[in-house]
Amino acid sequence: MGVKQRVAAFSLFRAALCLWLLCGRTSGKPVRKCGGANPCGSPGPPVVLIPGDLGNQLEAKLDKPSVVHYICYKKTDTFFTLWLNLEQLVPVAIDCWMDNIRLIYNRTTHSTSSPPGVNISVPGFGQTYSVEYLDPSKRSVGMYFFNIVQALVDWGYTRGDDVRGAPYDWRRAPNENKEYFLALQGMIEEMAEKAGGPVVLIAHSMGNMYTLYFLNQQPQAWKDKFIKAFIALGPPWAGVAKTLRVITSGDNNGIPVIRPLKIRSQQRTAVSTSWLLPYAHSWPKDKKEVRETLGGQEELPEDWNTTAKVFREAGRRVLGVPSGRKMEEMTWWWSPKIQEINPRF
């Protein structure tokens, strides 16, 4: 789902969401706005926002041994915005961006790392700015959680206090983001203790999978004490069919200057992409999930009726994987390790 669609979905939902959050304090009366000469306390429980895939800013600092183009920066003294930076998504410059944001998979450790000399950081944990706007310049194309945050602020919440963001490295699956979950747990506990009551978690898209994964690791006593509610916006509980297109032919998320096939190589390196593939435990074994054309091939054969078969053949025909070798030995995104971390209810 593109940024514009996300904003539309949030706008439709925010009125009902905020009424639910505030119903315990308002008793049906209109909510008065706060600020300036009209201060007031928090109107409801603390709120934590967990973004989806591509849903928060990423920054990078470079000290690379080599670059893919002479125009690419090889070394930077400070961190700069990697996502969302529209200036880096234009032709030629996008090659620099892709080389910086990609992940390298280690088939031995089943873990990923950034390219040599690339240091990626996630700005704004505990704040809201990096989830309100994906582009620090606050261009409308990068507006994300802004409408929800601003509505909460108008009703008495304070940015960075009782409404906070929990951004993360969305390129990775949750098993590689353990430090993030420890920080999230600590922030939830801090907010609950300060407010004298539990916290509301609001997640969008893949953020719901991250949230569910996090909650499944917590004992019931912890959840009873610190979590008031978990509000799921657009949760992909059964996986995302669009992921098939992302990996087989690429997806530009509606950005016209980016060719899908150009961005495909980077999208394939993100472990989170494979994590969103339709989950085997959610679909009948005989359900056909794909009937499309693939590259220069004719219509997919009749027996390509499962995700597994699609990717075996896609890898062999499109990626040039030798037919005598297992896919998991050639491409990280077919590794059974990915399926092992799927969240369950």
Question: Where does each model-flagged region fall?
Answer:
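N-terminal non-catalytic accessory region
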Residues: 2-202, 206-278, 283-295, 300-305
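C-terminal subdomain of alpha/beta-hydrolase-fold enzymes, centered on the catalytic histidine
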Residues: 301-345
